[in-house]
Amino acid sequence: ARNAREFGDKAAYREKEFGIWQSWTWLEAVEQVEALALGLLSLGAEKGDHVAIAGRNRPYLYWAMLAAQSIGAVPVPIYQDAVGDEIAYVLDHCNARFIVAGDQEQVDKILDIRDSLKNLQTIIYLDPRGLRKYDHSMLKQYQSLQDEGRGARGDLGDELAKRQKAQTYDDTCVMLYTSGTTGRPKGVVLSNRNVIETSKNSSQFDDLGPGEEVLAYLPMAWVGDYTFSMGQALWTGFCVNCPESAETMMTDLREIGPTYYFAPPRVFENQLTNVMIRM
């Protein structure tokens, strides 16, 4: 909301789809988040509920995390390439009632394990391709849920405002699961204080401002992406750019020309190798 007031018509998010960059301003992003938050309330989402998110980096999935937070729920991002058993463990461990799935691949993985998930109530899917003939008894399309939320603003607007006002600095902000290389993944709980202070201090250290351009390509379930693509973006007001796919990432990187770019050593090694091959 602060960024919408201060930066209004400035680009907040971009996504490349079918080779074309789509963009949303801060004002548009706030409306998207609010519509989904109201939609979640219409589904009966309660304070403290866990809302899982599975898929590649997309503005809509970042907004899903913000929508969950705005109603007092806890977002739980899941690694995009997680297999069914891994997803089942996370959803069961955190007692997730809702999950936002990016596409048919993610929906299929969840439907395969749904019988073992007693608490899962609704699967909210983003990309409808391939899902038209599915049984929709527990499926809900993302944009349709937003439309329902917009229609319920008169009835649920006060409840949303009440939940937002009731949040504190030490409330849970997000739950991130470890990779599980040494055993079962562990849920790491970060408070609003954890995320805000880390984002503030790291942004000040790197002298980041609202004019930065960042490419969001690292796993959404990783604490690094959460800090860079969520925390710092909200703190500074810079623009988060989501590539079309892993295959187009380098092309998308050149087109955006990020002013702030984070990568683990392996990514830089691969980039250096590609350059050396072409020389």
Could you describe each region identified by the protein language model?
Residues 23-27, 165, 173-199:
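Conserved AMP-binding A3 loop
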Residues 50, 56-76, 80-84, 92-98, ...:
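A short helix-loop-beta submotif of the ANL/AMP-binding
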Residues 9-58, 62-66, 83-88, 138-146, ...:
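Conserved AMP-binding/adenylate-forming core of the ANL superfamily
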Residues 43, 70-148:
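Structural core segment of the AMP-binding/adenylate-forming
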Residues 51, 68, 99, 172, ...:
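Conserved S/T- and glycine-rich ATP-binding loop of Class I adenylate-forming
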Residues 8-11, 124-125, 143-177, 184, ...:
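Conserved pre-ATP/AMP-binding loop-to-beta segment of ANL
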Residues 56, 99-111, 128-129, 258-279:
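Adenylate-forming
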Residues 196-213, 220-279:
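Conserved AMP-binding/adenylation subdomain of ANL enzymes
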